[in-house]
Amino acid sequence: MSVTEIKPIKEGKVREIYDNGDTLIMVATDRISCFDVILKNIVSKKGTVLTQMSKFWFDMTKDIIPNHMISVDVKDMPEFFQQEKFDGNSMLCRRLNMLPIECIVRGYITGSGWAIYKENGTVCGIKLPEGLQESDKLPEPIYTPSTKAEIGDHDENISFEQSVDYLEKRFPGKGQEYAEKLRDYTIALYKKCADYALTKGIIIADTKFEFGLDENGNIVLGDEMLTPDSSRFWPADGYEPGHGQPSFDKQFARDWLKANEHDWELPQEIVDKTIDKYLQAYELLTGKKL
């Protein structure tokens, strides 16, 4: 008997979202995006790394904030998802009303934050100490929110005050409260997970979280969590400020694209090295192999 095909209700750069009545099913594909563009390559096992890594962190941090994960076992999902292509990379989730802010936290100065700091000594309106070098650890993690871009557009960094206004427009009377909670949850999550990662030989330089509201108006952690797609992971062994660091994430692919003037198809060698980095990070952090 054939199984009725289900079409996604939303396709993001990397994920597909399926309607499942009161819940959603989020499938992490093997697509890869850089600079807000979906590349032509498929990176085998990448979707499984993203889903299983998120599960690991969601389980670890539910004492700080509830999250949207219900199950990553396809047996808990409709029959359509009990195909091999969905096994390991699919997550049954609670429905949330997602808040329109990307919650970025930076523990080290790198990437776009470093570029802005070199110009004016600040990041997203936050004054930082003088004389920092690239990849330096910051005295305290900083919260630097951004807007959420549509596919093909770029996210825009905003100040904390702008995030209050942005949320107030969507949720009158709640802007300040929500903005403060997003900031506090983001920093608490980062601190707990960065401390843990360091014991496994990985520096989490920065990451982003996304949050939504449940049916009772409570803030819940959604989307993905501390994956190589949403974070910069550096090997702690050999960490040396003053320049960019080797990494366990898609920085490897980004660097190749920068050097090759946005040719949106990676050579197979770069694809293979990218998934090797993802798998290494997963194994170091979780102690498990995929």
Task: Map each language-model feature to its residues.
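Conserved metal-phosphate-binding beta-hairpin within the catalytic cores
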Residues: 105, 204-225
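Anionic ligand-binding catalytic core segments
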Residues: 119-122, 127-177, 221, 225-285
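A long amphipathic alpha-helix within ATP-dependent nucleotide-binding catalytic cores
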Residues: 171-205
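Surface-exposed helix-capping loop/turn segments at secondary-structure junctions
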Residues: 63-68, 192-204, 217, 286-290
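Coil-to-beta-strand transition motifs
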Residues: 23, 98-100, 200-204, 216-219
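Active-site loop/lid in soluble adenylation, ligation, and acyl-transfer enzymes
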Residues: 1-150, 262-290
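Intrinsically disordered, low-complexity acidic/polar segments
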Residues: 35, 114-115, 216, 230-232
